């Protein structure tokens, strides 16, 4: 009935599909923060909320939230996904450190990063059956501050196979997440190159 402009709240991710559909149909859609549309009076219902938003919009009292263009929004989606993968990877690392400690494998005491050069080599060899601290210490990278002797003393496996099993699963998950991060980085890089080629002004 002659409607050309629509205002809607940005609630979580629920608005995105509806917003895209309305814009695709030619409507001028204003996305507003819920703080602007808060109605203190009376009991809240969806219908009353809609009527209140319509009234504020018709009086010109709502300001639109910033919305990135489609290219920026696409990169932002990938970037957020990458951040989630990094958080999962960090959680995996913390759990691996816990299981190593429970097996009397105090790797975090002798290396700065248990998934760094020395740490990764030691974990991989340990999971492949090498449980002697002296042999694992030989995998020390040349720039590691601790000596082979110090590393060997810190790695004295107590034989707990249950923790060994858990460590193996966390290590597999960690490697999978690292690959996903690399794949996401490649995707972001590819998209950025496409956007730059599309817009001569961005070169």
State the predicted function of each range.
Residues 1-203:
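A detector of single, family-specific signature residues
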């Amino acid at each position: 009935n002659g409607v050309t402009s629509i205002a809607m709240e940005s609630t979580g991710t629920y608005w995105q599909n509806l917003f895209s559909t309305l814009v695709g149909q030619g409507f001028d859609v204003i996305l507003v923060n819920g703080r602007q549309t808060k109605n203190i009076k009376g009991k809240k219902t969806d219908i009353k909320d809609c009527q209140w938003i319509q009234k504020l919009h018709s009086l010109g009292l709502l300001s639109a939230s910033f919305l990135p263009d489609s290219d920026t929004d696409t990169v932002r989606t990938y970037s957020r996904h990458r951040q989630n993968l990094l958080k999962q990877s960090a959680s995996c690392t913390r759990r691996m450190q816990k299981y190593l400690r429970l097996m009397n494998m105090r790797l975090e005491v002798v290396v700065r990063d248990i998934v760094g050069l020395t740490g990764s080599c030691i974990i991989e060899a340990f999971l492949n059956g090498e449980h002697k601290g002296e042999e694992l210490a030989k995998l020390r990278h040349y720039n590691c501050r601790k000596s082979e002797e110090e590393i060997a003393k810190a790695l004295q496996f107590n034989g707990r196979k249950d923790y060994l099993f858990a460590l193996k699963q966390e290590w597999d998950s960690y490697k999978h997440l690292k690959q996903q991060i690399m794949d996401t980085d490649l995707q972001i890089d590819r998209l950025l190159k496409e956007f730059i080629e599309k817009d001569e002004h961005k070169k």
